[in-house]
Amino acid sequence: MPQTAGPDTIRILVSTDNHVGYEERDPIRKDDSWRTFDEIMQLARTKDVDMVLLGGDLFHDNKPSRKAMYQVMRSLRKNCLGMKPCELEFLSDPAEVFEGAFPHVNYYDPDINVSIPVFSIHGNHDDPSGDGHLCSLDLLQVAGLVNYFGRVPEADNIHVKPILLQKGKTKLALYGMSNVRDERIHRTFRDNKVRFYRPSQQTGDWFNLLTLHQNHYAHTPTGYLSENMLPDFLDLVIWGHEHECLIDPKKNPETGFHVMQPGSSIATSLVPGEAVPKHIAILSITGKSFEVEKIPLRTVRPFVIREITLATDKRFKGLEKKQDNRQEVTKRLMQIVEEMIAEANEMWRSLHEDSQDDEDEEQPLPLIRLKVEYSSPEGTKFEVENPQRFSNRFAGKVANQNDVVHFYRKKTGTTRKPKEGKRELPEGIAEALEDSDSISVDALVQEFFAQQSLKILPQAPFGDAVNQFVSKDDKHAVEMFVMDSLSSQVRGLLQLDDDKINEGLDSHIEDFRKVMEKNFLSGQQKQAQRRRRFKEKPEGWDSDLNGHWTLQPEAIEELSSSPEPAKEGGRVRPASRITVGDEDNLFEEEEFVQKTTAKRAPTTRATRKTAAATRATTATKASAPAKKSIAAPRGRKRANPFQDSAEEEEDVIMDDDDDYKPAPPVKAPPPKPARETQTRGAPKTRQTTLNFSQAERPTRTTQKAIEISDDEISEDDAFESMPARKSKRY
């Protein structure tokens, strides 16, 4: 396919699972991921494509490092920004397909010159989380470098709306569906709660392209998305998440569409699927037809993997009968590894032999993986060396010098008896732990809960919290989950009547657990946003030796969630939520705390004497300073809206007294509201001079968005849609 296409051809560079930031702390492999991503972006510029389509997992970590974010932004800015005009005409309503502070396509922004737009969905590694439900793609979108689409706000009610693009006579409907937990999306498709929208004009002329990020194969009965669940009006599906490169499109005979699996651009696990040569694809769409040009990636580190069985391999025949055969077995295994290293180096040279640009490039160390099954007949034995020690023999020759070899025994039908006082692991978990290459946190949790039942804590949120703790490095995920679940159970039990309590609490606890489980599976229950409160740093604490004080577990005093409604005089009054700049709510909460505290504190003779002594002591002082001493803390709090609400409440409670009546907060000095009005008015005046809407571009002022409607599907189709709304335009 020529690099320059005709006026009716849309050229798209397709790539998935870049995993920028993978092994960035490894002294040898630290730069592999971003170098390959930079090569992909350079190919987009040199091949003169119209756009780049990324299928999720751009970053390896949910919270990418500054280095990873810097390298991605540098590569995007270097290769995707420029004066070359983008020939793609955007026909959708941007508010329907984009979210965030700038809900429009970046190459229509009058302040940014984008020559190659990048469209991306998120995967399971870079998915939204935390306060604000943001992800790394939101940062790239707000910087104008990426068009982040395919969000799934409700996992149990998914609406997939396309981005409508046109170049010449070719019309492209680009659908995106970001990653959802596989069991949940499988159930959502099964329950017919996924609706695809189609253009209302010239429906049959559009090339329908879908990109998603899910399990492609049945790892578990419901832990994947079947191709047959997708609607048959699609023309091509770009399948992310699977790392094996199967980039040649394959047609599904039942649905009629083609499926392309580009695979990852870097090996993140030492398995056979990662050893397939890595490619990216340039997809050329003309009308309703398409062509694929696959391009091998040159910066990928060569990877060779083998698996041998010592009992059947001719090179080890008879060694199991000899005593002290460890040295001989190690020697022959080293010869096999040397052959694999030579094979990997030859692969790299053959890929670069016709390239003049890479003559001065140093050949990288290869990735080598040798899986050895060393079980032997009864009465014989293969003695193998420690895998760490064996791998270190190849330091300076391989990139993975700590895990070159993996020894394992053949699984037998005999079961081991657990020692007294120790519980045996379930069979599935034991097998997963033995095969370290295929171990998965989700699989371990599911297998464990299949053998062990929970009485109070809900199972699905528990598994999600463990996954957040391990995969997303959220140190407080499990703690927050347990606190939320227990507090919900306690609140539910306190609301029970005496008759229900006498019947027994076990059934009610089980009912509450099922409700929490159901709410989580439907996406209604999320982990509460919490504000951490830290203790004061001890004197003499050395951050260089002991680390930052705020990162220590003993530094956290409490994790306070959003305040629950408090009762006042038999009436339920919701506690005020303190937000930055919300001064009225700040004082309202202080007043509310004072009232409730005063009511709860019992009045005794001792307290009355203390109050009288306090008033007598106060009377001896000057009256003006005494009044200011009460109002001063309020003034400081008003000036600093970022102060922790918990500290404010403690200060108010300490100063509270039974006989003291605080001044109502509504009698605040009038100049402060006046200043607030002025500060609010200034931004409005400035904002009228700046308009970042799509209509500012002169060439698009007369353009109208094409309406899209949900797909018309027959009654016996598995994707029956809800009735279309007549008054709403898409």
Swiss-Prot record:
SMART domains documented for this protein: Mre11_DNA_bind (SM01347)
Disordered, as annotated region: 521-730
One of the record's GO cellular component terms: Mre11 complex
Binding site residues for Mn(2+) 1: 17, 19, 57, 243
E.C. numbers: 3.1.-.-
Compartment(s) of residence: Nucleus; Chromosome, Telomere; Chromosome
Entry's Gene Ontology BP terms: double-strand break repair via homologous recombination; double-strand break repair via nonhomologous end joining; meiotic DNA double-strand break formation; mitochondrial double-strand break repair via homologous recombination; mitotic G2 DNA damage checkpoint signaling; mitotic intra-S DNA damage checkpoint signaling; telomere maintenance
Protein's name in the database: Double-strand break repair protein MRE11
Swiss-Prot/TrEMBL cofactor(s): Mn(2+)
Keyword DNA damage: yes
Keyword DNA repair applies: yes
UniProt-listed SUPFAM superfamilies: Metallo-dependent phosphatases (SSF56300)
Keywords: Chromosome, DNA damage, DNA repair, Endonuclease, Exonuclease, Hydrolase, Manganese, Meiosis, Metal-binding, Nuclease, Nucleus, Telomere
Low complexity compositional bias, start-end: 595-633
Xref: InterPro entries: Calcineurin-like_PHP_ApaH, Metallo-depent_PP-like, Mre11, Mre11_capping_dom, Mre11_DNA-bd, Mre11_N
Bias (Acidic residues): 581-591, 645-659, 708-719
UniProt-recorded Gene Ontology molecular function terms: 3'-5'-DNA exonuclease activity; manganese ion binding; single-stranded DNA endodeoxyribonuclease activity
Family designation: Belongs to the MRE11/RAD32 family.
Compositional bias annotation for Pro residues: 662-672
Principal EC category: hydrolase
Subunit record text: Component of the MRN complex composed of two heterodimers RAD50 and MRE11 associated with a single NBS1.
